[in-house]
Each structure stands twice: as structure tokens, then as C-alpha cells.
Swiss-Prot record:
Function: Part of the outer membrane protein assembly complex, which is involved in assembly and insertion of beta-barrel proteins into the outer membrane.
Subunit structure: Part of the Bam complex.
Keyword terms: Cell outer membrane, Membrane, Repeat, Transmembrane, Transmembrane beta strand
NCBIfam families in alphabetical order: OM_YaeT
PANTHER family: SORTING AND ASSEMBLY MACHINERY COMPONENT 50 HOMOLOG, SORTING AND ASSEMBLY MACHINERY SAMM50 PROTEIN FAMILY MEMBER
Organism for this UniProt entry: Nitratidesulfovibrio vulgaris (strain ATCC 29579 / DSM 644 / CCUG 34227 / NCIMB 8303 / VKM B-1760 / Hildenborough) (Desulfovibrio vulgaris)
Homology family: Belongs to the BamA family.
POTRA domain boundaries: 59-130, 131-209, 212-298, 301-383, 386-459
Protein name: Outer membrane protein assembly factor BamA
GO cellular component: cell outer membrane
Record-level GO BP terms: membrane assembly
Subcellular location(s) of the protein: Cell outer membrane
Length: 791
């Protein structure tokens, strides 16, 4: 290679001659000209590229081919190659491509060669496929179904054997066994190839071993903390007597780290700020699993000063009443992380109630390692007070915007208030139109204004339900219901119900408009017809009820209405009580009612906190006519208190009286009857009742009260399963007769299981009476259940 460099003024040129070393070909000239001496290096680079292109053009790849595939498409290989047409032959790059093809796992041999074709150089990769899987055989699997194993595998019949996928499949099958409790399961494989055939049988051999449960959970290293109390907060637990029912004792790998974090949190919540918790250790033995956690508690820290810093909107004294840490310090002198974190939320909500929607709360701790004391300072940045520009609804397909907006307690132009937003969410959830309600504050062009976006996810509000049910009073029955809670997307409730049994046949048609003209007034109507068969008489009824309700404040409702029934008593036994015989034939019942309800619970279907107070007063006969003259006030109070997630205390008390309203006795079916699964469990339905002194028939009481105390443990939240130990007691008596507490007060204890099933609430209760019966004998325990739809 030789040449010359020439410069004329500001321009220059380079002349280059490349000579064939063998002297066979003439010298090849190359020339380049540029302006400005500064471009000399780019000019040289360009000349080099021209020379390289000239001498490699004859070795450029004209095509890339794959040979030897039988089952696989050649594109499976070609799509993974980086070498393309026009690339120069590069041995290092080809070696990388061979490795890339080999790593696919489908081939037992890969070779590369270069051939000369009509269009130039052809790069050929020659492969030898591994056998095709024509059958998969599973040996030794009894506890896990073959279909489940095959479904978990990526290797399929008809595919080419791939060692990489096969290794993953063995791991998947092993994990499948682990999920079923077979932690010692060992899975191997072999390939049975037929001589001269391109296919083979893949055989999986499974050694299942014993199904293992957790036999011991160890918390090692504890000095001050109670091991039993620490174990109570773990999701993993030892196998016990009722594990077959509760599902405890099963090792779930995803819960190991969760429990390690739970122990750390428990230590922090009890003042052990420096606590260290090891990663969980799992030992598999022939008779069970041992799970161990090593804990180093460290010193326990007391609470020191509690203060506030930053942009405060109230005095320290007032803010101390907002947070819980100060009260915790008085009751328990040690630091608690969970209380401090709760305080962050409480302070954020407090500031939000004054319009500071984006207030930032940061808890700052100062630890004294010498004195083992922690000072806590809540640092607050209130940021901008904001107002609502617009309330927007998103996600509603069926429900109209006004149905959502009328439940909101915050509107366009209002100052943002966290309490009103939280109450709005509660109200929307209580409609039961939506499975999910979320709110989002969206900034606008003004710093002090936001749009409030209400995001709802609609759920199925209609139902067509049919079922077979049973109650101890109505016995076996068949029910059917057509119901819609959000008719036409306007929030109307409508239902048609039918029930047939040996004791009762009934039809009910109901309609409710909860917000007439989007106002506060609600209106409803119930039309019904029924036929009931009692021990001493039968009764046919046709009637209608109209009802109204109006909210009073945020949690209370006043209701009123009117009921008009025409009923007939017939087939009355000759020895029936006089009070029953007096009503033989057709009668008219004209009844007005007034009710008051205050409900502060957090949920209609699954309350965990709050109270319900109800009073229902009926006024029959007198100035509004009819044959039934009575006054019937009933009061009920319920309270819920959550002890821990899925653990709720529930108390209920109900009492009432029925009074004469003019002449005549109170009808027997307007009097009180208690006993059974809805009042005093362990006694027959409606069995706790005064009896006619002559006939011995139950004629109901005119004074009634009962109490239910329950501990609700939802042990399977996803299935809605709960165990409910209970204590019931109550009285039902006739005020005109002699009263004796020892005879009238009835008590029972027992256990109930509840299931929120797709067909409705199912209840299974076993109650044991604690008092003697009328005959002076001790009653035995009684099992009751109710299921299906009863009206």
C-alpha cells in the first residue's frame, strides 16, 4: 500500500494504491478529497472503510441456512441467530452462534460450515435433533393426579425432548407435591429410546414419601417475650386436633418470610427496637416439619418525650388528644411502632378534616442507647389547603351518576374534608352496588383546587335464587327469589319471593325507592299472600304494607308506614285456647307503625365495629279501624367490637311488650314467641311461650326480652366460614299471670358455624339449655340449622 497527500489552500486530497502481494491483480486506486485540515482523520477513517469493504465483499454471507431439523421448524433456530445476510464471515461470531443454538436444548449436535452457492457464500448450520416425545409415563404417583402433573409440565407429547425444559418440569412437579404437603418427594426421569426410531418415551419416577405437617414451631433466643404469645401472631402453626377442619399445620413457603417479618414487628411493637430475627429454618423429618426462628431481643426501650414539629394547626395539648401514643405511654411505658404508625394516619386524617388533603406526617425518633429511651416527634408539613373543583364518577356502566353522587357527603366547591370523604366511601359501600370504591384527588390548574374522582367497580346486583331450605319451625321447604338491588341503575330494589313447605306457603312482592327524586325520603311497598298451618289452627292472609323512611343526621333513620291485612282462621281444634277460637273466620288487621334506627356499624353484611339501635312501634285498631286492637313497642340494641382481624365480639339484646288497645284480647299471632336459632338457641323454635292453663297450647307472651352474646371467629375469610361460641338468655311471659324469675328465665350455651355461601347465609348451631323444662326435666342439647331463603 502506497500513496500521496496533497494540500492546496484549505483543501486536501489523499491518493492511495493497494497492491496485490502476489502480483496477480493490478494495483487498486482509492482517492478522497476534503475541505479543512481538521477533517484529515475522518478522511483516513473513510478510506480505511472503503479498502476493508473492497477486500471483504467477496467473503460476505449471501445466505444463512439450517439443516437437519425434522420436527422443529428451521425458523426456531434462525430467529435466535444474530448473523444476517451481508455480514462478513467471522469465525468467533460463528462459534457464539453454535453455542446459542446448543443452549436451546433441542439438539444433540450442532456444526457450522461454509458453502459456495450461486449467489455467493452460504453459512450452513447442521443440527441433530433430540428424540421426539411420543409418550409421557408417570410412575409412583398416587397422591397427585397424573393430569395435574402433566398440566404443570412444559414438556408435551409430540414435542422435541429439551433438557432445559425438562429440568424445569422436574422442579415444577416437586413444587406440586410440596403444595400438597409431600416435602420429601423426589422426582427423577429417564428417556427410553427405541433403536432406530426418532422418538422416545419420557418416564417420570416419583418417590412421594410421607405427607408432612408442621409438628413444631420454635422461637429460639427469647428471654423476656413469651413464646406462646409470639406464636399466636404467626400464620404458620403446629398441627392440632382440629387441623383437618381449620387447615392449620400445613407449611406454606410464602408464609415463612411473612412470619419472620411478623416476629420483627411484634418485637418493635413491644419496645425491642434493636431486635434481630433470623431467616426461618425448616427441617424436614420423617414424622413432620420443624420451623425455627432465632430471635435476639436486645434491650427494651421506654417511651420518652412525645412532641410535634413543623406546620401545626393546633396546640400540642390538642394534638396529643388526636394521637394514641400518649395514652399508650400512660398504660404501657414501652415504645410501640404500630401505635406510632397509627398516629401518622390519625394526624393525616385530622389535617384532612381541615382541608389539608396532602399533609405529610413523618415520625422522627431519637434513641438513647444508654438510657434505653426513645423520644418521638411528629414532623408535620400541612401543604396547601384545597377545595373540590368537581366530583367525577368513573367506572359505572349501569349505575347512573346521580345514584353515586347522592351518596357523597362532599360536593363541587366544598372545602376538602377527610371525614366527609370517608363517610362518602362508607355510604357507597353500604349500597352494595359496588364491589370496590376508590377515590382519587386529581390536581387542576389551580394549586388550591382538585378534582375528586370517584372510581367504582360494579358488582352483580341481581339474583335468581332457588333452593331447598330447612328451619325447625317451617321444616323442609322450597324457595325461589328474583331480586334486583339496583333496578334500571337508579338504585331501586325489587324482589319476588316464593316459599313452599308443609307448614307455610307464601308469596311476597316488594319494591323500594331509597331516594325519591334523589332526596332523602324513601318509599317502599310489600304485597303478600300466605297460608300457614299451626298446631291448633290454620291461617290464610292477604295484605299490603306501605312504608316511608327519612334520615335524621348521618347515622339515624325515622320510618313510618301502614299495614292492612285480611286474614282467616280456620280448622281450629276443639280444644284450642279461647284466645284462638275468638278469631275464627275472617278478620281485618289495620296497623300503623313508627320505627327509629341508628346504625354506626362499618358494614351491613359483615360488621366488625359500631352499634345498631332499633325501636319498632306498631299501633293496631282504635281510630284506624280493624279487628285487632293492640300496641306493640319493640326495642333492639346490638354492638360489635373487633378484638383482632377476623375476631369480633357481638352482643344483642331485644325486648318488647304488647298492650291491649281498647276492647278485646291481643291476637295470638301478635304476641311474642321466642326460642330457636334466631333468639334462644338450644330450645325448640317458638317453644318459650306462656301456655293456656286449660288447653296447654302456646299462646305467646305480652312481655319479652332476650340477650345474645357471641364471639365471632372468621377462620376462613375467603369462604366466609365462621365459628361462633354463644351464650343466650331470655324471658317471655304473660304480665297478667304470676311471674317467677326462676321459672321464666331461660339460658343456653353452644357453638354455631356460619357460612356465607352463594345461596345465602347458612347457620348450623348446637345449643345446650341450662334450665329445666316445664316438666322439671333437664333438656338435652339441640342441633338446629337454617339454610336457603326463608321469608
Amino acid at each position: 500500500m502506497y500513496g500521496s497527500f496533497t494540500q492546496l489552500g484549505d483543501s486536501f486530497s489523499i491518493d492511495l494504491r493497494v497492491v496485490d502481494a502476489l502480483g496477480v491483480k493490478p494495483a487498486k486506486p482509492f482517492f478522497i478529497q476534503k475541505q479543512g485540515i481538521i477533517n484529515i482523520l475522518p478522511a483516513v477513517d473513510e478510506l480505511v472503510d472503503r479498502v476493508a469493504g473492497e477486500f471483504t465483499s467477496g467473503n460476505a454471507i449471501a445466505d444463512v441456512k439450517v439443516r437437519g431439523t425434522k420436527v422443529l421448524d428451521p425458523d426456531v433456530v434462525l430467529m435466535r441467530l444474530s448473523t444476517r445476510k451481508g455480514d462478513p464471515i467471522d469465525p468467533a461470531a460463528i462459534n457464539k452462534e453454535i453455542k446459542r443454538i446448543w443452549d436451546l436444548g433441542y439438539f444433540s449436535d450442532v456444526q457450522a460450515s461454509v458453502e459456495q452457492g450461486g449467489d455467493g457464500t452460504v453459512l450452513v448450520y447442521t443440527v441433530t435433533e433430540k428424540p421426539r416425545i411420543d409418550n409421557i409415563v408417570i410412575e409412583g404417583s398416587d397422591k397427585v393426579g397424573h393430569d395435574d402433573i402433566l398440566a404443570a409440565m412444559s414438556s408435551k407429547t409430540g414435542s422435541v425432548l429439551n433438557d432445559k425444559l425438562l429440568a424445569q418440569d422436574l422442579q415444577k412437579v416437586t413444587e406440586l407435591y410440596r403444595k400438597e404437603g409431600f416435602y420429601l418427594a423426589h422426582v427423577t426421569h429417564r428417556v427410553e429410546a427405541r433403536q432406530g426410531a426418532a422418538s422416545a418415551t419420557l418416564v417420570l419416577n416419583v418417590e412421594e414419601g410421607n405427607k408432612l405437617y408442621i409438628k413444631k414451631v420454635k422461637i429460639e433466643g427469647l428471654k423476656e417475650l413469651s413464646e406462646s404469645e409470639v406464636k399466636d401472631i404467626l400464620a404458620l402453626s403446629e398441627r392440632g386436633m382440629f387441623s383437618w377442619f381449620t387447615g392449620t399445620g400445613v407449611l406454606k413457603d410464602e408464609l415463612l418470610e411473612r412470619d419472620s417479618a411478623a416476629i420483627t414487628a411484634y418485637c418493635l411493637n413491644h419496645g425491642y427496637v434493636d431486635a434481630l430475627v433470623s431467616a426461618p429454618k425448616v427441617d424436614y423429618e420423617e414424622d413432620g416439619i420443624i420451623v425455627s426462628f432465632a430471635v435476639k431481643e436486645g434491650p427494651r426501650y421506654k417511651l420518652g418525650k412525645i412532641g410535634f414539629d413543623g406546620e401545626l394547626i393546633d396546640t400540642d395539648e390538642r394534638l396529643l388528644k388526636v394521637v394514641k401514643l400518649d395514652d399508650h405511654k400512660k398504660d404501657n411505658q414501652y415504645f410501640a411502632l404500630d401505635v406510632m404508625q397509627t398516629d401518622d394516619k390519625l394526624l393525616s386524617d385530622y389535617y384532612a378534616d381541615y382541608g389539608y388533603a396532602f399533609a405529610e406526617i413523618n415520625s422522627r425518633t431519637q434513641k438513647s442507647a444508654e438510657e434505653h429511651v426513645i423520644d418521638v416527634t411528629y414532623v408535620i408539613r400541612k401543604r396547601q389547603k384545597v377545595y373540590i373543583n368537581r366530583v367525577l364518577v368513573e367506572g359505572n356502566q349501569k349505575t347512573r351518576d346521580n345514584v353515586v353522587l347522592r351518596e357523597m357527603r362532599i360536593a363541587d366547591g366544598d372545602m376538602f374534608e377527610g371525614a366527609k370523604l370517608r363517610r362518602s366511601n362508607e355510604r357507597l359501600n353500604r349500597t352494595r352496588y359496588f364491589s370496590q370504591v376508590d377515590t382519587e384527588l386529581v390536581p387542576t390548574q389551580k394549586e388550591d383546587e382538585v378534582d375528586l374522582k370517584v372510581k367504582v367497580k360494579e358488582q352483580n346486583t341481581g339474583a335468581l335464587i332457588g333452593g331447598v331450605g330447612y328451619s325447625t319451625f317451617y321444616q323442609f321447604g322450597v324457595s325461589g327469589t328474583i331480586m334486583e338491588r339496583n333496578l334500571f341503575g337508579k338504585g331501586y330494589y325489587a324482589s319476588l319471593q316464593a316459599f313452599f313447605s308443609g307448614k307455610r306457603n307464601s308469596f311476597i312482592a316488594s319494591f323500594t325507592n331509597p331516594r325519591v327524586n334523589d332526596g332523602d325520603l324513601s318509599f317502599g311497598n310489600d304485597a303478600y299472600i300466605s297460608r300457614e298451618y299451626f298446631d291448633d289452627f290454620s291461617k290464610n292472609t292477604i295484605g299490603d304494607t306501605i312504608r316511608f323512611a327519612l334520615p335524621v343526621g348521618e347515622y339515624s333513620t325515622v320510618g313510618w308506614g301502614y299495614r292492612l291485612d285480611r286474614y282467616e282462621l280456620y280448622d281450629i281444634d276443639d280444644d284450642a285456647a279461647k284466645i284462638i277460637k275468638e278469631r275464627e273466620g275472617e278478620n281485618i288487621s289495620s296497623v300503623a307503625h313508627v320505627r327509629f334506627t341508628r346504625d354506626t356499624t362499618d358494614s351491613k353484611e359483615k360488621p366488625t365495629k359500631g352499634t345498631i339501635f332499633k325501636t319498632f312501634n306498631e299501633f293496631g285498631g282504635g281510630p284506624i279501624g280493624g279487628d285487632d286492637d293492640f300496641i306493640k313497642p319493640v326495642v333492639e340494641f346490638q354492638a360489635y367490637h373487633q378484638l383482632a382481624p377476623n375476631h369480633v365480639l357481638h352482643g344483642r339484646t331485644r325486648g318488647g311488650a304488647v298492650l291491649e288497645n281498647g276492647q278485646g284480647d291481643v291476637p295470638v299471632f301478635e304476641r311474642f314467641y321466642i326460642g330457636g336459632i334466631d333468639s334462644i338457641r338450644g330450645y325448640n323454635s317458638r317453644d318459650i311461650s306462656p301456655r293456656d292453663p286449660e288447653s296447654g297450647d302456646r299462646i305467646g307472651g305480652d312481655r319479652m326480652a332476650f340477650v345474645n352474646l357471641e364471639y365471632i371467629w372468621v377462620f376462613k375469610p375467603d369462604l366466609g366460614l365462621a365459628l361462633v361460641p354463644f351464650f343466650d338468655m331470655g324471658i317471655n311471659y304473660d304480665s297478667s299471670a304470676e311471674f317467677n324469675w326462676d321459672d321464666e328465665l331461660k339460658k343456653s350455651v353452644g357453638l354455631e358455624m356460619r357460612w356465607r355461601s352463594p345461596m345465602g347465609d347458612l347457620r348450623f348451631a348446637y345449643g345446650f339449655p341450662l334450665d329445666e323444662g316445664r316438666d322439671g326435666e333437664q333438656h338435652s342439647g339441640r342441633f338446629e340449622f337454617s339454610m336457603g331463603q326463608f321469608f
